[in-house]
Regions:
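Sec-dependent bacterial lipoprotein signal peptides
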Residues: 1-17
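Hydrophobic alpha-helical segments, principally membrane-spanning helices and signal/leader peptides
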Residues: 1, 25, 108-110, 116, ...
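N-terminal start-of-chain detector that recognizes signal peptides
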Residues: 9-11, 98-102, 153-159
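C-terminal/domain-edge helix-coil "capping" segments
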Residues: 17-48, 121, 134-229
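N-terminal segment of the mature soluble domain
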Residues: 44-137, 189, 193-200
Length: 229
């Protein structure tokens, strides 16, 4: 599913942070979907890959970031649930990914499978799927190799290392300011109905750390998420 083509009309500005959203007109319909799974996030890059990188290396980075965004969005939803602001059950992200692996669905494959099929695999009523599009200048990351980039992405979400998170300007490029957009949707696992949709558009300074960039976007998505008590 390409959630950019679902008829959501948006006027987005090129400065700051803008968002537009759609919620199913029958709120009770949304609330009848009690269990939700957050899917790996579809990543779309419009910049150039660093010189010398293979297509496989680029794909590995995309999938690593997909899981990083998924983990962050899931965490933001759990925060809201812990504060009594989310009236729904969110499946643990580890369980979501384990179930996908067990049936042979990889990160990239999950981006395009129908919501109904994914919901059946995961045993949930609805799935939250997101598409992130951004320009990446990764030339400063090339010398570190794909393993270094992937390690940093996972390291920043390890609670045991929160005190050691530092800025990695080489991860996204030095002194670059570009735009990032995120399209999020909650989709029925029964008939594919769009229950909720939001588009967030921001101007990002890529000298910020990876976790700041990722969590800034997912925090905005979580604030717009339905099921608020």
């Amino acid at each position: 599913m390409n959630i950019r083509h679902l008829g959501l009309v948006a006027l987005l500005f090129s400065i700051g942070c803008t968002s537009v959203s759609y919620t199913h007109p029958e709120v009770a319909t949304i609330r009848s979907y009690r269990t939700i799974a957050v899917l790996p996030v579809e990543m779309v890059f419009t910049g150039k890959a660093p010189a010398g990188w293979t297509a496989e290396q680029v794909l590995d980075v995309e999938e690593a970031e997909s899981l990083a965004f998924q983990t962050s969005f899931h965490g933001r939803l759990l925060e809201r649930a812990g504060r009594g602001r989310l009236d729904a059950d969110v499946q643990p992200v580890d369980e979501t990914n384990r179930r996908l692996v067990e049936v042979g669905v990889g990160v990239r494959e999950s981006w395009s499978l129908p919501a109904e099929e994914l919901a059946e695999i995961l045993g949930v009523d609805a799935v939250a799927r997101t598409r992130v599009e951004k320009t990446r200048y990764m030339s400063d990351l090339a010398s570190f190799g794909i393993e270094a980039g992937t390690y940093v992405l996972y390291e920043i979400f390890d609670d045991d290392h929160d005190d050691h998170v530092v800025e990695f300007p080489w991860l996204f490029g030095l002194t670059k300011t570009h735009d990032i957009s995120a399209d999020g949707a909650l989709v029925s696992g029964y008939d594919g109905t769009i229950l909720w949709q939001v588009e967030v558009y921001r101007s990002i300074n890529w000298t910020r750390s990876a976790n700041e960039v990722i969590e800034g976007i997912t925090r905005k998505l979580a604030r717009k998420f339905p099921y608020r008590s």
